[in-house]
Amino acid sequence: MKTITTARLPWAAQSFALGICLIALLGCNHAANKSSASRADVKPVTVKLVDSQATMETRSLFAFMQEQRRHSIMFGHQHETTQGLTITRTDGTQSDTFNAVGDFAAVYGWDTLSIVAPKAEGDIVAQVKKAYARGGIITVSSHFDNPKTDTQKGVWPVGTSWDQTPAVVDSLPGGAYNPVLNGYLDQVAEWANNLKDEQGRLIPVIFRLYHENTGSWFWWGDKQSTPEQYKQLFRYSVEYLRDVKGVRNFLYAYSPNNFWDVTEANYLERYPGDEWVDVLGFDTYGPVADNADWFRNVVANAALVARMAEARGKIPVISEIGIRAPDIEAGLYDNQWYRKLISGLKADPDAREIAFLLVWRNAPQGVPGPNGTQVPHYWVPANRPENINNGTLEDFQAFYADEFTAFNRDIEQVYQRPTLIVK
């Protein structure tokens, strides 16, 4: 049974939380053992990974998610403990999620912007270790700078990952900018190979390379590269990290945009291949107004990746999801959004088997808006008057209380499952 820790919530939020608790006491059958990995009779699980030499903990993470997804959908949040609207420290001990519901996200998202120099989003090693110590799952996306223009930075987005100058071909072996890409990968590998817990064991990471490649806003997008060129970039990067740099604690994720024509053929057009991918995902953002069609599309895409993952021995996820940024930044909201999302997913026999969904960050000062203003940029409703009064905090708390969502305390034995690996 999952309850909201009301001691940390203001009076209005406590009222809703107490209502949720009362419902639970009167018979809400929340799964007390949603993490089946905590059962005492667990037998070794056979896994086949991109890296046949992956660490025991990395293999266990994969096996855990394969089983966990049959029982619940884990909640993830980018910059869970390093950015927020209600936190006073960014040392990995506080989060907006925790302040809203009394628990951390199960999946903690970060990015190479905290790994590759100049670490624009701040170093995260200590925070990752804290998340891992409490049994959380770590995922890292890759906003690599444009290798072709990274020395020309000045006016945004020149030189960043959002610089749409085509650079895929020039970043591959034989290309003029391959050494630049290798430099990024070298820093990722050094970070991964030194990311260890207190016992000196490597901490597993779901590494999400070159996401949203079916759009055209990154230098690796569909207008910047052919499907074959993109596949070569993805494969090269995995091979370099795994075989050249000896990274043994990565699961590799592939995450295009959602498709409106939801077919396996469309998903596979730029897919690097089963040999190179452990996790199948997709990224999707939708409107506040008239969003019924978008929610149906989310379910359709989730069902597709779940079926494909089942057939291919992979893990299906929604790697990014949320209200589109322009609506958030305009101050628009949907105080049923989280409930619509979980209701739609769990009602579909395939979509309900995604392992996790992840929403984007809660920028503490927002982002630059028109005429020198700062506008909102957050995806987890915070425990503050604005979100209490507009009903979005209540919506998120209802999502938390749903029997089919899993947060940090709901998952156990993530890294202790016995496994046998297929080579």
UniProtKB/Swiss-Prot annotation:
It catalyses: Random hydrolysis of (1->4)-beta-D-mannosidic linkages in mannans, galactomannans and glucomannans. This is Mannan endo-1,4-beta-mannosidase. The keyword Signal applies. The record marks 211 as: Plays an important role in maintaining the position of the catalytic nucleophile. Changing residue 377 to A: 100-fold decrease in the activity of the mannanase against mannotetraose and 4-nitrophenyl-beta-D-Man2. It hydrolyzes polysaccharides only 10-20-fold less efficiently than the wild-type. It is an enzyme of class 3 (hydrolase). Changing residue 278 to A: Retains significant activity against mannotetraose and azo-carob galactomannan. Residues 56-409 form the GH26 domain. It comes from Cellvibrio japonicus (strain Ueda107) (Pseudomonas fluorescens subsp. cellulosa). Substrate binds at residues 121, 143, 162, 217, 285, 360-361, 377. Changing residue 320 to G: Lack of activity against all substrates. Gene3D superfamilies: Glycosidases (3.20.20.80). One of its GO terms (molecular function) is mannan endo-1,4-beta-mannosidase activity. Changing residue 283 to A: Retains significant activity against mannotetraose and azo-carob galactomannan. Lack of activity against all substrates.
